[in-house]
C-alpha cells in the first residue's frame, strides 16, 4: 500500500521520523526505528498526527476551497507550533504556505492537509502571504529581519509566536532580549515597520486542536500596538475557534512567553485578571 493510501497518521508519523532538526522550522527530532521512543518522542508523534486531524483529514481537505475573502497565510517555520497553527487556518478555509529551509521535507505534511496547503522557501512564503506567522527560535528573528524585513513590513499582520528560551537560546541571549524590553519590543526592533501582534506564545502546540471551538472560550492573550493588526489578529483567532484577549501593547509581550504568567489554558476573565496585575 502506498503512503498516500495509508491512514493520515501513518503518513505523518513517517514524515516525523525522517524529518531532521531544522533551525527555522523547529522540526521534531529524528527518531530511529532502532531506538525505543521516549515519552517526549511519542508526544512529538502525536503532535504531528494532529496536523492532519485538525484539518479534518485528507478526504475532507480535498473538498476545501479558499473563499475570495480568505487571506493568504504564510508561516516562517513549519515545525510543531507552525504546523498546528497553519492546520487550523487551513481548516478555516485559508490558503496556507508553510516554509522552512528545506521545504521538500514538508511534502507529506502539506499533502495530508489538502490543496489549500503548500510548502515553500521562506522568501516565497513572505511574497505569498497577506499575514505571516513567525514561528522560529528567537535567535533567528534578527536574521529574518535582515533578509526579509522589507517584505514583512508590507504585510497586513505579522503574528509573533516565537519565544526566547534560555535552555535553547542561552541565558545571555535571553538577558539581551530582556534588556531590549522583552519579546515583542525586541521583535519590533528586528522587524522595523512590521505590523506585529504577539499571540499563541504560552499554549502548548498539542493543545491547539482540542481547544479550538471548545466550550468555555479558551483564551489567547494577544499584545500589540497597531490597531488594524490587532483587529485582523482578533478575526483570525476567532475563525479558528479561540477567543483573543487583548492584554496591552507590545511592551506587554515580555509576559507572553512560555513559563510566564499567561502559560496554560485560561478563560478570558482569567486572562484579564492576570493582565491587571502586570505592568
For each feature predicted by the language model, list its residue ranges.
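Rossmann-fold NAD(P)-binding glycine/threonine-rich loop
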Residues: 162-196
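N-terminal secretory signal peptides and thylakoid transit peptides that target proteins
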Residues: 15, 22-49
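Short, conserved loop/helix-junction motifs that constitute active-site signature segments
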Residues: 148-155, 191, 214
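Conserved N-terminal Rossmann-fold NAD(P) cofactor-binding segment
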Residues: 67-70, 91-131, 135-151
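Intrinsically disordered, low-complexity segments enriched in serine/proline and basic residues
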Residues: 2-5, 10-11, 24
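Internal alpha-helical scaffold of NAD(P)-dependent oxidoreductase catalytic cores
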Residues: 120, 182, 189-196, 214-253, ...
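Redox-cofactor binding/interface segments in oxidoreductases and associated redox assembly factors
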Residues: 133-137, 159-160, 198
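NAD(P)+-binding Rossmann beta1-loop-alpha1 motif at the extreme N-terminus of oxidoreductases
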Residues: 41-108
